[in-house]
């Protein structure tokens, strides 16, 4: 969704609070907790989970490995839940033709750099760049803004899976609004 008029373009960015992240964090947490509890059950010699039997699992080779995988999975799961809780990556792109300023805002992890805020003059924007990355199973289309003195800045939403036609249309609208050219490959 773009809120745009003739002189102002505001595009909200979703960030990490997506259904897929909730799904993967939940599945990872459940699996990691199961691995850890089965490994710990083999250490204690009794079942902590009524559904999973740990009687055949010997602690020294298998139980330790299952505990290790469980702890590693719990760390990855907690990282995913932190990104969801802090909504890392969300923000907005704002282009104001009236003042001639481009503002890009994103939320990060807590700390000194929690708020990522880029602000630069509109005249420093050289072009909109569209990049297509294809691999065996999927293709990813990324939209960048080329700005003088800065590396290419990604503009497209993280979870946005637009096809090539939609991405070209979005790039054309943005380039028309900014009065710049499009580079694509």
Curated annotation (Swiss-Prot):
A single cellular component GO annotation: chloroplast thylakoid membrane
Task performed by this protein: Seems to be required for the assembly of the photosystem I complex.
InterPro entries with a match to the protein in the record: PSI_Ycf4_assembly
Major location category of this protein: plastid
One of the Pfam families matching this protein, by short name: Ycf4
Record keywords: Chloroplast, Membrane, Photosynthesis, Plastid, Thylakoid, Transmembrane, Transmembrane helix
Example GO biological process: photosynthesis
Domain of life of the source: Eukaryota
The keyword Thylakoid is annotated on this UniProt entry: yes
Cell location: Plastid, Chloroplast thylakoid membrane
Transmembrane intervals: 22-42, 57-77
Family: Belongs to the Ycf4 family.
Topology in membrane: Multi-pass membrane protein
Entry protein name: Photosystem I assembly protein Ycf4
